């Protein structure tokens, strides 16, 4: 699942990072669970959470789920602390409630992130691969839309 971006450059002093990555690749961080969403029309990435520990690149897809907010199978998983990336590229999310395999989860600050154009809100969504109880790590597949 993991894909490597072309380069990573740390901007000293302000703890920000700039990365040249493919459009369908995001860099996820752990510690305070930082994620970066690649822009669609440019090779730069934009933050949707805060933190500083790099965990690796993973494939992702955008999905705007604002219209799905009231559906019971859409779960907003808050960060920090929700994103866990294993070295082999597997992704785990911390379940805030009991989950059933196939339920949808979202990654972002309060479940939300600024989109690529700076307008509106987007999520990176994932599908739970297994049943899980609240407080446990759930292996997920990033949703293809």
State where each predicted segment sits:
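Surface-exposed, low-hydrophobicity beta-strand/loop segments enriched in small/polar/acidic residues
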Residues: 1-145
């Amino acid at each position: 699942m993991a894909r490597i971006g072309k380069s990573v450059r740390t901007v000293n002093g302000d703890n920000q990072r700039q990365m040249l990555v493919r459009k369908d690749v995001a860099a996820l961080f752990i510690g305070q669970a930082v994620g970066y969403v690649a822009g669609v029309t440019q090779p730069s990435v934009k933050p949707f959470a805060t933190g500083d520990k790099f965990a690796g690149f993973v494939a992702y897809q955008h999905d705007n789920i604002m219209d799905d907010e009231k559906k019971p199978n859409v779960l907003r998983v808050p960060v920090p602390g929700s994103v866990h990336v294993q070295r082999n590229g597997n992704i785990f999310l911390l379940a805030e409630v009991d989950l059933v395999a196939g339920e949808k989860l979202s990654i972002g600050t309060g479940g939300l992130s600024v989109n690529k154009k700076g307008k509106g809100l987007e999520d990176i969504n994932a599908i739970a691969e297994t049943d899980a109880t609240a407080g446990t790590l759930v292996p997920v597949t990033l949703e293809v839309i």
